[in-house]
Amino acid sequence: SGLLLATTSHISTDIASAPFLWAPPLIAYIATFIIVFAKRPLISPAMADKSLLFAVAAALLMLNVPVFNSQIVVLGLIIHIGALFLAALSLHGALVARRPAASGLTEFYLLMSLGGVLGSAFVALLAPVLFNDIHEYPLLLGAALLLSPRFLGKGVRLTLDRRTLTIGAGILLAIGAIWSTFALLRADTDGSMVTRRGFFGVVKVYSPAGKDLTLMQHGNTIHGAQIRSQTDRPTPLAY
């Protein structure tokens, strides 16, 4: 549930602002419950488990791709919602595989619901206090990958062989290096002045490199612009 809220926050503020954009992630999330509790699942959680590493890698890389046309918007939505779907399918499948006998089902479903509440509370209440941007999204993507059955197996010990673990670690390190490089480049060029996060998302005031402008931006939407050189009476340029 935490990843559901984080994904919804990211796509509705940093990719596109559109009515009912919260619906596709919710549909994908609920669909995973329908699939894993079915007698004959349409998609095997094991298949989702095998694809999860690549889905998380694609989602992390998309975090630093600028949204400049409708094709990027559509691609971003597909990748982020797809990563949510595969992560939820893998982890929910692991829960169902550990479902106890009838005598323990009440406790099982109660704890599952409690986990959903705690995940939602972390994203909705705690993350806005801890982070000034939607940093919980990549953190929860990584957590979903590390908690997947492919990494943890049936117990808490890692069950990967050395070769698979090395390849996976190398891919994650490469993702981290590329992501960090893009983040540093953006930090050097975006001229960030103030970043604040509240109930309605992240608001940022910055000065683009090489331009005599100060911009106010919410998500990927620019809400105002002023010329910096007019110190006596800055002229509003846009809203």
Language-model segments: what does each one mean?
Residues 1-239:
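Alpha-helical transmembrane segments of multi-pass membrane proteins
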